[in-house]
C-alpha cells in the first residue's frame, strides 16, 4: 500500500521528511516495504515550498530479511524487500489524515495532499512533476482510475506531488 503526501510545509516551517518520520511512528503496526521515496519536484513552480519535495512510503507486512534503515526515538527502523501482506488502506488513510491535519502548516499557506493507493500512478506524472507543471485535473483523473483514496486540505494542491 502506497502512502504519498506533499505540500505540508511552508516557506517558514515544517519539513516533509520530518512528517514522514511521524507517519512511520504512527503507522508502526506496519513495516516499510523498500525505502521511503523522496521526490524533488520542479523548483521553478510559483507555489513551491521550502524543499519542494514529496514523499511516498510503501507499507505492509514485510517478508524476508529486514534491513535496518535508520532510527526513530532511539528505536531501529527496518525495511523489507518484499511484502507478505498489504496494509489496510482505510487504517492508513485514517491515521495519516490525523497526523497531517495536526502537523501541516495550512495556516502558513500549505495546501496538503494525501494519497493512499494499492497501485502506482503512471510514471509520466513523476517526470512531469520533476520537470514541468502538472494540472490537478489530470492528477484527479489518474487517481480515480487507480481507485486511490485521497484527501486534500486548503485546495489540495499537494495531491499533484503526492501522485
Predicted regions located by residue number:
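Conserved mixed alpha/beta catalytic, RNA-binding, or beta-rich assembly cores of soluble enzyme
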Residues: 1-163
